[in-house]
């Protein structure tokens, strides 16, 4: 719903240098697929309840018109599979990855089921929107794409590579206080 958030900081530093060469980013505004003049993309939950739900017809149309067959689709949701280092590494091998940034109470479940969408969570907490979660996922994945990091060994020597946390880090000067 807010494509203007992207690429954000991903357009800076090493990620920014690699953007357009080693990785690409496209955004879709689902409001462009709304059927009314006000571009409404949400409605109240069927059966009642608090909050709003992203409408099935709008989301499905945006997916159908923008995603090719067999491309992986992930809906960023607090109830999904927990995102971790191992999964980031696995996703870095995908030719294309489509992230749905949720808002409100979520998206109509019928779209998730009918489009073979995987739900992924970055943790047990609630964010105001899925864009922050998308940045977490993208940042983690981009590190594994060969050539993105300045040093090829950096991604292989990460603290999680051996299942352990990294040792304390120091730099110069040796005595600072």
PLM-predicted stretches and their roles:
Residues 31-36, 81, 126-129:
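A short acidic, often aromatic-flanked loop/helix-cap motif at beta-alpha or helix-coil junctions
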Residues 53-103:
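S-adenosyl-L-methionine/SAH cofactor-binding core of RNA-modifying enzymes
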Residues 132, 144-177:
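Internal, active-site/partner-interface "lid" segment
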Residues 38, 85-87, 110-112:
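Short, well-ordered secondary-structure micro-motifs
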Residues 111-153:
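Structured adenosyl-cofactor binding patch, chiefly the S-adenosyl-L-methionine
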Residues 26-28, 74, 97-99, 118-120:
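Hydrophobic/aromatic beta-strand patches that form the interior of the parallel beta-sheet core
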Residues 1-66:
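N-terminal nucleotide/polyanion-binding subdomain common to many enzyme families
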């Amino acid at each position: 719903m807010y494509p203007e958030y992207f690429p954000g900081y991903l357009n800076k530093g090493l990620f920014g240098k690699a953007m357009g060469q080693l990785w690409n980013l496209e955004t879709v505004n689902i409001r462009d697929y709304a059927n009314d003049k006000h571009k409404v993309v949400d409605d109240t939950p069927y059966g009642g309840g608090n909050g709003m739900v992203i409408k099935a017809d709008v989301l499905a149309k945006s997916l159908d018109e923008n995603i090719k067959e067999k491309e992986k689709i992930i809906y960023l949701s607090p109830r999904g599979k927990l995102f971790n280092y191992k999964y980031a590494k696995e996703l870095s091998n995908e030719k294309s990855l489509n992230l749905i940034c949720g808002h409100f109470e979520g998206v109509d479940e019928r779209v998730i089921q009918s489009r073979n969408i995987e739900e992924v969570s970055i943790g047990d907490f609630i964010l105001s929107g899925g864009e922050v979660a998308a940045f977490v996922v993208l940042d983690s994945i981009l590190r594994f794409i060969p050539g993105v990091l300045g040093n090829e060994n950096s991604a292989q020597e990460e603290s999680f590579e051996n299942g352990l946390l990294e040792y304390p880090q120091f730099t110069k000067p040796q005595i600072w206080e």
